[in-house]
């Protein structure tokens, strides 16, 4: 059935221009359907695109127009988000469920159409309703128009998509988390949909991802973390990497033997096959904070780098394993991200030195009483439900309309307000370890409420945001993803942000441009950007349980003074919520 489906579903590429020529149109058809997959002795029904896990790679050249027809054959509504694509003046195609559009109903179709402008590198796409992105995802590759890279041209590029294998129904998982149940865990990490040979059931060993290489050649590994819960360490035994890009932007080349990638991030690394021809294991390993934070199982997957000239049995020798950090040691992630800088080139945008609006956002957790109670026993009792917060506000998603529609129509009443708090209600020691586990002090600091509070900006405003992770209830890192924008990551640090001390650390010369900003565990991150893309843009943590719990808001960017700086009307293929 899947084979016949793939034969009838044409993934067409129309008028794709030759390198250096005119921009073309890249067209795909995504058929979203159910598929049974057996892992660890159990068969699970999952949702996939075109019979593939991960889904098809969208491969375009800078300047192309992308057209994707999505056919929904599953019993749930869904949208497709083009993670990291700027969507300049095409906010209607962003694909954020109930933010820019209502979901595509079962049995219906929708077309996404947008241009890829001034971006080169690795992004990705994924479902953006409930937990469906676990299996509905794929790489989105943007190649330079002139065919030239600011690093040695690889012989091949390979997506390395890190994910997780869930046996639990993903819609049920979403429902359970919204009800405050966070005891469910995936069974394994995956590399390109494969669990790897460290997983087995009744002696049946799971299949591993295999990367075949030729000695002396270089490979561009496009490492993407699609997981729900964890940052991942990625290593290949006997090999080193040169990090050259992240989130669709070039980086100053940085040599390392390990990559750390948080949920939502895409990291480009060059790997030269310069080891003695043999077989070498690759490992992805999830990290997590140590106790007293709540603990999760060890998520790991093992793949293989196989030299084509090597003996099939590796000359009878054991296959080398990379030495991985302790999973409870999160500092390698901090140092990896802190060592990255942007590559200066003629098209690299300059950091805004003047700031019009400053925002200070505390990322934390809070509790509210269940049901309609006004008072209840707090501190993780059965009377409360835990929520993720930004400045003590937990975001409430609309489920019958889309925020962009209401903004465009000028009818926000009863749906959202524009009073998102730009600073926390009270200052405190945000990274005090005594706040873990919860006690009486948290009850004073974390009063929380649910609301749909947005922030409005005028066009061409220079914005600075300090994201501060807190230790309220636990000490997670927070990968914050802003739709529609790349932001300058000026600095990251540990502890509570202190402006007098920490502003001296800001990198104004060659900061990274990122769409997903990892705010360190017990630390902070400072970003700046110019509001030059009108529309409704979702800001949220990319840990699935954090977004479901409410660590989100949306930014409204007003129109500029000209049609070229304004949000156009919905395109003909756009389906309004009342017509979905």
UniProtKB/Swiss-Prot annotation:
Residues engaged in binding Cu cation 1: 81, 481
Subcellular location: Secreted, Extracellular space, Apoplast
Enzyme class: oxidoreductase
Keywords, sorted A to Z: Apoplast, Copper, Glycoprotein, Lignin degradation, Metal-binding, Oxidoreductase, Repeat, Secreted, Signal
Disordered: region residues: 560-580
Species of origin: Oryza sativa subsp. indica (Rice)
Residues annotated as binding Cu cation 4: 478, 541, 546, 551
Stated family: Belongs to the multicopper oxidase family.
Co-factor(s): Cu cation
Catalytic activities: 4 hydroquinone + O2 = 4 benzosemiquinone + 2 H2O
Alphabetized InterPro entries for the sequence: Cu-oxidase-like_N, Cu-oxidase_2nd, Cu-oxidase_C, Cu-oxidase_fam, Cu_oxidase_CS, Cu_oxidase_Cu_BS, Cupredoxin, CuRO_1_LCC
Cofactor note: Binds 4 Cu cations per monomer.
Superkingdom of this protein's organism: Eukaryota
Any single GO CC term annotated in Swiss-Prot or TrEMBL for this entry: apoplast
Protein name, as recorded: Laccase-20
Glycosylated residues (UniProt): 36, 42, 115, 200, 339, 392, 429, 460
Function: Lignin degradation and detoxification of lignin-derived products.
UniProt signal peptide: 1-23
All copies of domain Plastocyanin-like, residue ranges: 31-147, 156-310, 419-561
GO MF, one annotated term: copper ion binding
Listed Pfam families: Cu-oxidase (PF00394), Cu-oxidase_2 (PF07731), Cu-oxidase_3 (PF07732)
Binding annotation for Cu cation 2: 83, 126, 542
UniProt EC number: 1.10.3.2
Residues that, per the record, bind Cu cation 3: 128, 483, 540
Gene Ontology terms: biological process: lignin catabolic process
